[in-house]
């Protein structure tokens, strides 16, 4: 038999998973075991929640007595360093199973009685804003015990970034972490991606196209929340491939008041038929703004950034065009001049390549900034796959970054040039004895030369 047909032994097998209960038990055990075995990975998942730097101990299905009933959380994680100890209960859901508020409240009560620091939940639910929990509980129970949430996408992203980019010192530990990644990426693991815009997506989409959507309509809030969750998912997946943290861009008020962000999205959707957000990738020229226009059926990504501060208008435009060698010719460029009101001169890249002057509305005005945008067709289906809204947004972001943004560099002024002694007037007077030369290099020479030109 050919070796190609042999199945390589796996540390965490996916065969034999029957039902969601077995799926959750296996995912919990695999994750917690790898957290305790791989030092850097365990630290990456626990340190943000206040755990000290130390060895991670992990346990599954630890029983507790709460009043007259028995409570069994999916897991318990403990980190100890010297006399300081941090512990958290862990609740896990896989597949389409969602967290239950009543169950989490009982775990918060157990954690308070036992002196634990937190309850950590893991599921496929992606909250629209980082730090926000997808499940509502009695806030009084959070006074002494913190509650944190991680999506499986976040867990997988952290695992990939730790292994492929940040690194794992011990080769055996790196292999173990790789086995967890293989497991979580398998369809049977129950660690799913963002794959549903919700049951309200289709009626809200149709209401937008018909012009009948109102802010009070049922389901409009859910669509707004899921769009923000989609952007968070896009950040996690893109960050996993780039090896850096990609984050949604939110104002301070939007971060502290999720309701304000949702109302803003709903207002834009009702008034203009658009869902808009932005993501930030480190070291890029600008944040990427993503706009899904439900009326036009398009997804547009764009960046705004400063033009060079010197040179003629044509020189500044050519500076940008040279950086867009790999960009599609349908990319749209808009040039904004100083003290200009309203939109600037705009055209497609293929036109600007042939005639940069099309982006100059007034040669007497200095070009101050550019906008580069790419538009693609928006999918309409609520789920994943061909023709889906989710995939059309994800593809638009990935393509725009790969073909445009990663090639753009911000302008920086050239450093001043230091004149050498060879530039002195004396050096140019060949055959004249040094003692007879009466001229020498002066700081005023460049000024005179500039006037002569």
Where are these regions (language model features)?
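Charged, terminal alpha-helix-loop-beta segments
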Residues: 1-453
């Amino acid at each position: 038999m050919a070796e190609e047909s042999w199945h390589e032994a796996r540390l965490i097998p996916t065969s034999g998973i029957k039902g969601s209960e077995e799926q959750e038990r296996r995912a919990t055990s695999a994750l917690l075991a790898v957290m305790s075995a791989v030092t850097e990975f365990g630290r990456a998942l626990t340190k943000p929640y206040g755990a000290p730097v130390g060895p991670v101990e992990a346990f599954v299905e630890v029983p507790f007595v709460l009043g007259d009933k028995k409570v069994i959380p999916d897991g318990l994680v403990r980190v100890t360093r010297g006399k300081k100890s941090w512990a958290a209960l862990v609740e896990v859901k896989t597949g389409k199973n969602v967290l239950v508020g009543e169950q989490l409240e009982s775990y918060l009560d157990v954690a308070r009685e036992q002196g634990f620091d937190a309850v950590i939940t893991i599921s496929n639910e992606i909250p629209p804003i980082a730090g926000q929990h997808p499940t509502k509980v009695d806030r009084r129970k959070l006074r002494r015990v913190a509650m944190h949430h991680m999506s499986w996408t976040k867990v997988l992203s952290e695992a990939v970034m730790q292994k492929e980019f940040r690194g794992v010192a011990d080769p055996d530990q790196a292999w173990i972490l790789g086995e967890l990644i293989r497991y979580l990426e398998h369809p049977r693991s129950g660690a799913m991606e963002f794959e549903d815009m919700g049951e309200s997506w289709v009626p809200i989409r149709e209401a937008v196209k018909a012009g009948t959507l109102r802010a009070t309509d049922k389901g409009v809030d859910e669509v707004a929340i899921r769009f923000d969750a989609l952007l968070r998912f896009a950040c996690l997946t893109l960050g996993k491939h780039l090896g850096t943290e990609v984050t949604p861009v939110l104002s301070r008020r939007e971060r502290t008041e999720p309701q304000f962000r949702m109302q803003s999205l709903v207002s834009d959707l009702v008034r203009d038929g658009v869902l808009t957000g932005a993501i930030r990738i480190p070291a890029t020229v600008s944040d990427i703004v993503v706009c899904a226009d439900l009326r036009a059926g398009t997804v547009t990504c764009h960046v705004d950034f400063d033009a060079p501060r010197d040179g003629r208008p044509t020189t500044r435009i050519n500076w940008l065009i040279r950086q867009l060698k790999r960009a599609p010719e349908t990319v749209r460029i808009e040039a904004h001049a100083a003290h200009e009101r309203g939109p600037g001169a705009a055209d497609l890249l293929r036109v600007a390549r042939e005639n940069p002057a099309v982006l100059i509305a007034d040669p007497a005005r200095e070009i101050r900034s550019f906008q580069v945008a790419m538009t693609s067709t928006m999918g309409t289906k609520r789920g994943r796959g061909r023709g889906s809204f989710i995939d059309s947004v994800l593809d638009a972001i990935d393509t725009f970054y790969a073909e445009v943004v990663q090639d753009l560099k911000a302008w920086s002024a050239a450093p001043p040039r230091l004149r050498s002694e060879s530039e002195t007037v004396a050096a140019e007077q060949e055959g004249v004895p040094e003692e007879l030369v009466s001229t020498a290099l002066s700081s005023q020479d460049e000024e005179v030369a500039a006037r002569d030109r």
